[in-house]
């Protein structure tokens, strides 16, 4: 009986090693094919070893199907990855790409807000939410996100200029001018900050 158990355990170990090697090789093949623009080949390489319970496979397939233009399929892979690891940020950031590509901005906003629940100071989500609301002319909403970005990164050119433009749109010209000026030591030839200062004169 003991000999049978040892043999079974040994067989499982060998199978797991073979499975690991096949998965690793499939990932490597997918990276090579992605680099050449063969997204279909990259996807097929991973589908040969696909396991719906694998976070990594779902994450990678979400990216590759997005690149190939399969936005609905991409969202499904990313959602599966999110369900497997709900506190992971990278899968939520990935989901945003196909959602934005099909114009589903409510889903984009929901994912960024969820990221901020998980990591309240995640500057990329803060900045992108600010950009979305700025683009919608919802400047008061944009303001709170850009303010937080600048508080976290006071010398960041993009954060400073977007906060400056938001103040400009809200007719807070003094604040806008100060922020445009603060942005220029970072990027002395920054066209956005220079344009803003020119408009305020």
Model-derived regions: residue spans:
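Structural marker of alpha-solenoid helical repeat scaffolds
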Residues: 50-52, 84, 118, 152, ...
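Terminal, low-structured helical/coil segments at or just beyond the last alpha-helical repeat
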Residues: 20, 169-201
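Helix-start (N-cap) detector for alpha-helical repeat units in TPR-like alpha-solenoids
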Residues: 23, 55-57, 89-90, 123-124, ...
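Bacterial N-terminal signal peptides
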Residues: 1-11
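Alpha-helical segment of the N-proximal tetratricopeptide repeat
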Residues: 22-51, 56, 60-67, 97-100
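Mid-chain, structured segments of secreted extracytoplasmic proteins
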Residues: 55-104
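Structural signature of tandem alpha-helical TPR/SEL1-like repeats
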Residues: 35-44, 68-80, 101-114, 135-148, ...
